[in-house]
Amino acid sequence: MAELACFCYPHLENDSYKFIPFNNLAIKCMLTAKVDKKDQDKFYNSIIYGIAPPPQFKKRYNTNDNSRGMNYETSMFNKVAALICEALNSTKVTQSDIASVLSRVVSVRHLENLVLRRENHQDVLFHSKELLLKSVLIAIGHSKEIETTATAEGGEIVFQNTAFTMWRLTYLEHKLMPILDPNFIEYKITVNEGKPISESHIKELIAELRWQYNKFAVITHGKGHYRVVKYSSVANHADRVYATYKSNNKNGNMLEFNLLDQRIIWQNWYAFTSSMKQGNTLDTCKKLLFQKIKRESNPFKGLSTDRKMDEVSQIGI
């Protein structure tokens, strides 16, 4: 995750702003600079290489002292920054909005995946600039539309029916901020269209999850799609979701946190996010992840549980 101010800076033109991507050398200069505390939140002028991000975001970049940040010296950083600017410059951002836009926390890996989709000649985003920019604006929280299958970050499709598409995320192969754990495995489920979904299509998805992904929890980050993650990583997701929710709320970037369909979401996660939306502390919310919560009733009593052992998935073991 990183703020949009880590990728670009605004330049006032008439009554709106044009966004310009940072270059690698300007960032590198900022990372070595000594800056007064009072200037930590201001864009840094490197003199030689142009404007750089505010020094308060130093930890967002990979350095000798911090291996958890973005690999900003890669060509992928340049591509992501340019794509963000292209999308923002297709809209009108006024002075009253600029602070909240730049402080918005976005998924670095999501944006890299959109670059990869753009470069894939077989992908619809390669052929449609309008759909590409729409996908980016959704990814950076500049659009209130949810991420659907057409505008999704992408990955490897492992399941699809009339209503849903399930993707295996390919973060292990990323350049900008790769997942370093070789055992990482995670999925995302997007809706194919933003319209009501029939019971039969929901039932198909639940059956697929129950039998093929029984070692995983179905959660949501509140953005209109589902994530299918290992139970061992749920607490980490909770920390990130809570921090992003609070940060966006504090900076005035509050979008509606979508709890999604309670029949699909893991009941403990539904309790966690509901508690978070009520304004409770992180510790109070996280306790709900480890309590035994029983569903009031089986939402799909016709869904058979009669499966032979060799039909039950070993994914995630």
From Swiss-Prot:
Active site positions: H225 (for ntpase and rtpase activities)
Official protein name in the record: Non-structural protein 2
Homology family: Belongs to the rotavirus NSP2 family.
Keyword Translocase (UniProt): no
GO terms classed as biological process: viral genome replication
Function: Participates in replication and packaging of the viral genome. Plays a crucial role, together with NSP5, in the formation of virus factories (viroplasms), which are large inclusions in the host cytoplasm where replication intermediates are assembled and viral RNA replication takes place. Displays ssRNA binding, NTPase, RNA triphosphatase (RTPase) and ATP-independent helix-unwinding activities. The unwinding activity may prepare and organize plus-strand RNAs for packaging and replication by removing interfering secondary structures.
GO molecular function, one term: nucleoside diphosphate kinase activity
Leader sequence segment: none
Source organism phylogeny: Viruses, Riboviria, Orthornavirae, Duplornaviricota, Resentoviricetes
Keyword rRNA processing: no
Cofactor: Mg(2+)
Enzyme Commission number, as recorded: 3.6.4.-
Residues where ATP binds: S107, V108, R109, K188, H221, G222, K223, R227
Region of interest (RNA-binding), residue spans: 205-241
A Pfam match: Rota_NS35_C
Alphabetically ordered keywords of this record: ATP-binding, Host cytoplasm, Hydrolase, Magnesium, Metal-binding, Nucleotide-binding, RNA-binding
GO annotation, cellular component aspect: host cell cytoplasm
Major place of residence: host cell
Localization in the cell: Host cytoplasm
Quaternary state and interactors: Homooctamer. Interacts with VP1; this interaction is weak. Interacts with NSP5; this interaction leads to up-regulation of NSP5 phosphorylation and formation of viral factories. Interacts with host DCP1A, DCP1B, DDX6, EDC4 and EIF2S1/eIF2-alpha; these interactions are probably part of the sequestration of some host SGs and PBs proteins in viral factories.
Superkingdom of origin organism: Viruses
